[in-house]
Amino acid sequence: MNSLFASTARGLEELLKTELENLGAVECQVVQGGVHFKGDTRLVYQSLMWSRLASRIMLPLGECKVYSDLDLYLGVQAINWTEMFNPGATFAVHFSGLNDTIRNSQYGAMKVKDAIVDAFTRKNLPRPNVDRDAPDIRVNVWLHKETASIALDLSGDGLHLRGYRDRAGIAPIKETLAAAIVMRSGWQPGTPLLDPMCGSGTLLIEAAMLATDRAPGLHRGRWGFSGWAQHDEAIWQEVKAEAQTRARKGLAEYSSHFYGSDSDARVIQRARTNARLAGIGELITFEVKDVAQLTNPLPKGPYGTVLSNPPYGERLDSEPALIALHSLLGRIMKNQFGGWNLSLFSASPDLLSCLQLRADKQYKAKNGPLDCVQKNYHVAESTPDSKPAMVAEDYANRLRKNLKKFEKWARQEGIECYRLYDADLPEYNVAVDRYSDWVVVQEYAPPKTIDAHKARQRLFDIIAATISVLGIAPNKLVLKTRERQKGKNQYQKLGEKGEFLEVTEYNAHLWVNLTDYLDTGLFLDHRIARRMLGQMSKGKDFLNLFSYTGSATVHAGLGGALSTTTVDMSRTYLEWAERNLRLNGLTGRAHRLIQADCLAWLREANEQFDLIFIDPPTFSNSKRMEDAFDVQRDHLALMKDLKRLLRAGGTIMFSNNKRGFRMDLDGLAKLGLKAQEITQKTLSQDFARNRQIHNCWLITAA
């Protein structure tokens, strides 16, 4: 009896144990990452030929304690290598694990290689050669703490390489994991199986091979036992012949069918090639088709299983499309696949929740470094009384109501950018802004007392409902998470796409960027204030401080300002402002752009202006500013400097976003100024719910 070890992906150990026992293995013992078992020579070959789950089958040779590199060398050399393989065979060493002595895996592999070579040369035998790419023998050494485990890898290449996959293609899941997913899906061979996001077809091919009794090792050309001195070619040929006979019989007797589709024509072509190479191409129908076009291929029965490994996203900007995809799949399953089973394998359990289906079973597994889950569902047959469940129904109803109200209003006003929803319902704590045919959903970061999983699921429901109610393409929804602004945080960069969208606001054309920054380049709540500046600016010299992207300057210029001066500390935003001005034909010396610390510039400037707009941050301690700034504390000092630049009869429009801001009217009077609050006049319909989003004042000489 041989003592053997079969490795596998984390989470598949018990499944592998059952498979090995069915092959005839005895004394099976599950450990993390694999199964120890025993079997005769025939079982060695059968496990290599028939295991669909094992990553490798290894023959343990011994263990040794490693307190020095010499311990490793002597421990390896103690094995009788001349009984393992002939000197004419090539070999390679795979070394994994480190300790205080062996701190580099390459160094560990070199010491093992030296010990093996010396074991031959000391017996006056020819030195075996190393071949890292295609060796006859693979030696596996795993170092854990002070113990090195040494084994012969009888597999050669990993057993997931069945011999049918185009090696140029990147598989999101290995074939061994795909086989496990099939086994756990609840699908019964002999019933239909459909994968609507099949990629290169791995799940369907593994299922078809399982259903037709085709051994996973049947198409492999190389094995790790070819140079093994104890290899029994006669028994191996018997095992191989039996596998060939069973495969022919299984294919001839199989009567059901498999269906695969994907939106990518190139991967569908690869899937067809892979299926043909696997010997089961005639059983699978592959189509180029998007999930939105998915239909039941057997509407009159029999019932089958939909099995897939749908895409998932690691970036926030990919989530809206994936949420829409999963929501759509859930609706299609309910509408077209009543009575069928559904099984999905995913690295994102939250996305699976978008199906709006209740899972009957779930399994955990690792896909490389990713923690994944497989959930199985039974789709109830629909009845005449069945009504589709609405995702986030209260939110959807409010959004639909707001859309009806604001869409017509915005069209009459001549604006393309407006707020559709602003945390109207406390449990749906987001803002939804429309920018032409795009939508930005801003999630207000939930308090730490709210369960993170529930908050994320609520957000996914919001996105699915938003896409459904507004009827937009998922790739036209941008998702952001917003926290309370502190200083310069509003200017932090989120991406590098550099994609700008031209929008219209009254008679102005402006560039917005929906993805690269937390804000888009256009503060929607200041829309009316900008229009007022345009109406007040005819024939006047206009100054815009803390100008951001210069949208207020554009309105002033279009309103007939004699000159405009735009000041901001950010080169990025000044360049953006210049683009906005140029878009509206506002170029030349009359329109100056100045990069400077606005407070420092204000103290040093000696020019005069008729109309000044200033919208400073609530608080700022930017390294590039000379002093920290607090709008409540410092607004009088600001007004003192502004008064010096204000021409007789001129006006300052002063705005800020500090909640509870209190204007020091007595202090203003001492400066010879008076203030008129116009906050309510500058709040448009879409911001009527949030009356503290900004406060705005007109300041003139007393």
UniProtKB/Swiss-Prot annotation:
Domain THUMP: 43-154
GO cellular component, one term: cytoplasm
InterPro entries per record: 23SrRNA_methyltr_KL (IPR017244), DNA_methylase_N6_adenine_CS (IPR002052), RlmKL-like_Mtase (IPR000241), RlmKL-like_Mtase_CS (IPR053943), RlmL_1st (IPR054170), SAM-dep_methyl-trfase (IPR019614), SAM-dependent_MTases_sf (IPR029063), THUMP_dom (IPR004114)
Compartment(s) where it occurs, according to its Swiss-Prot or TrEMBL record: Cytoplasm
Entry GO MF terms: 23S rRNA (guanine(2445)-N(2))-methyltransferase activity; RNA binding; rRNA (guanine-N7-)-methyltransferase activity
EC number(s) recorded for this UniProt protein: 2.1.1.173, 2.1.1.264
One matching Pfam family: UPF0020
Annotated keywords: Cytoplasm, Methyltransferase, RNA-binding, rRNA processing, S-adenosyl-L-methionine, Transferase
Catalytic activity as recorded in UniProt: guanosine(2445) in 23S rRNA + S-adenosyl-L-methionine = N(2)-methylguanosine(2445) in 23S rRNA + S-adenosyl-L-homocysteine + H(+); guanosine(2069) in 23S rRNA + S-adenosyl-L-methionine = N(2)-methylguanosine(2069) in 23S rRNA + S-adenosyl-L-homocysteine + H(+)
Source domain of life: Bacteria
Main location: cytoplasm
SMART domains from the UniProt entry: THUMP
Similarity comment: Belongs to the methyltransferase superfamily. RlmKL family.
Function: Specifically methylates the guanine in position 2445 (m2G2445) and the guanine in position 2069 (m7G2069) of 23S rRNA.
Name the record gives this protein: Ribosomal RNA large subunit methyltransferase K/L
Naturally occurring in which organism (per UniProt): Shigella boydii serotype 4 (strain Sb227)
Name of encoding gene: rlmL
